[in-house]
């Protein structure tokens, strides 16, 4: 069965881009007799607010977009709020660490902005792997000095190809197009890429509709599906 999802972040009122994605996802799923899930991506509790999450549901109802499970209604894969699913992300991160695919990154935001890594055509900066080669002693010294590291995925030298419903076949070379991306921030907040993959897999999502600005997330998420 086709299972799609709409997964907004309740950090403000929905805009036309959000609503357009919701409508396309809903119509795509329902035209094939599938199920539509509403998931609230509220991991960043400093920016996300419960009243915005409630407004999402009100807006969808006003538009006549009825979800089959999720949101405040719950369902078999509850909870549908990412802030309540952190134990699942911890388990996934532990699995990746056990496979040697994770390393700490102590780069500051200023260092990342100043990095001489190549920039994608869409303006995104690819992490240059500054901390990838740190030894256990290097890491211990930084941690002893009170520095908290973020956690990154060690990206292999591989190519990922996927089919986009609008653009057709898209191919990206992971080291230069994605780089070693974040799994958990230095403040302990789980990164979008990890949480989305864990949730989509757990909820049996078979189709994702996203804006062009999030297209670069697709190869990262496909890569994470393999070990998880």
Where are these regions (language model features)?
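Active-site cores that bind ATP or allylic diphosphates and position pyrophosphate for catalysis
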Residues: 110-228
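N-terminal Rossmann-like or analogous alpha/beta NTP/dinucleotide-binding catalytic cores
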Residues: 1-120, 212-228
């Amino acid at each position: 069965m086709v299972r799609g999802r709409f997964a907004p972040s309740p950090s403000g009122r929905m805009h036309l881009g959000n609503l357009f994605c919701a409508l396309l996802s809903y119509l795509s799923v329902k035209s094939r007799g599938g199920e539509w899930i509403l998931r609230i991506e509220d991991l960043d509790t400093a920016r996300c607010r419960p009243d915005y999450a409630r407004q999402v549901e009100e807006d969808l109802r006003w538009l006549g977009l009825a979800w089959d499970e999720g949101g405040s209604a719950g369902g078999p894969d509850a909870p549908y709020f990412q802030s309540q699913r952190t134990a699942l992300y911890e388990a996934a991160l532990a699995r990746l660490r056990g496979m040697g695919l994770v390393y700490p990154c102590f780069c500051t935001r200023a260092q990342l902005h100043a990095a001489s890594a190549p920039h994608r055509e869409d303006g995104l900066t690819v992490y240059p792997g500054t901390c990838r080669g740190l030894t256990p002693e290097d890491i211990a010294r930084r941690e002893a000095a009170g520095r908290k590291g973020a956690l990154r995925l060690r990206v292999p030298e591989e190519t990922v190809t996927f089919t986009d419903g609008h653009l057709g076949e898209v191919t990206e070379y992971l080291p230069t197009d994605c780089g070693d991306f974040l799994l958990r921030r230095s403040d302990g907040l789980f990164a979008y890429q990890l949480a989305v993959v864990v949730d989509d897999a757990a909820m049996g999502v078979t189709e994702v509709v996203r804006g062009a600005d999030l297209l670069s997330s697709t190869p990262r998420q496909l890569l994470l599906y393999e070990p998880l």
